Regions:
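N-terminal beta-strand motif that seeds the catalytic metal site of vicinal oxygen chelate
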Residues: 9, 14-33, 90-91, 95, ...
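Vicinal oxygen chelate
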Residues: 18, 22-30, 58, 78-156
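A generic structural signal for short beta-strands and their flanking turns/coil linkers
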Residues: 21-23, 53, 62, 87-89, ...
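Core segments of cupin and vicinal oxygen chelate
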Residues: 28-72
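A short local loop/turn or secondary-structure capping micro-motif enriched for an aromatic residue
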Residues: 65-66, 72-76, 150-153
């Protein structure tokens, strides 16, 4: 009996060790109220701690912090990926296939203007994925994606 319990504990420790860790990302915004509405009402993120010049958000289990920078000026640059002009820099989350589909529908219903509309990228190739891009009200570019086979996230 003790051996069984110890085996389960070791297995749990291994699983916890290999689970992805949440990231923390702080981004500049020029108008905190406008961006707070976007991240909470449009993206559906839950707000955490806040002050008059920053707000924490739960972005699919990751900590995103909006920090006021009244002089924030986004330099827009694009690189070609799969024949599309991808905004750089950008950030986002890799979702499950079904979660991506419902999130893309939510964004469409909320009237988000896509830089790159949801589409299947690298079809039939390693790393096949659904992806979409849009800007938040401060001009920060976001990408959300879902891999057909999550084992191919780093496939080449």
């Amino acid at each position: 009996f003790q051996m069984y319990i110890r085996s389960e504990i070791v297995s749990l420790e291994i699983v916890i060790f290999f689970m992805p860790k949440p990231f923390h990302l702080a981004i500049p915004v020029d108008n905190l109220d406008r961006c707070n509405r976007f991240y909470s009402e449009i993206l559906g993120c839950e707000a955490g701690r806040s002050s008059d010049h920053w707000t924490d958000y739960n972005l699919f289990g990751h900590q995103l912090v909006l920090h006021v920078d009244p002089h924030h000026n986004v330099k827009k640059h694009h690189n070609e990926v799969d024949g599309k002009s991808v905004p750089v820099p950008h950030f986002g989350v890799i979702l499950g296939w079904e979660e991506f589909t419902s999130f893309a529908q939510r964004l469409t219903q909320k009237g988000v203007e896509f830089v790159i509309k949801p589409y299947l990228r690298f079809e039939g190739l390693p790393g096949e994925q659904m992806t979409l891009f849009f800007y938040d009200p401060a001009g920060n570019a976001l990408e959300f994606k879902a891999f057909k086979n999550e084992d191919q996230i780093f496939a080449s």
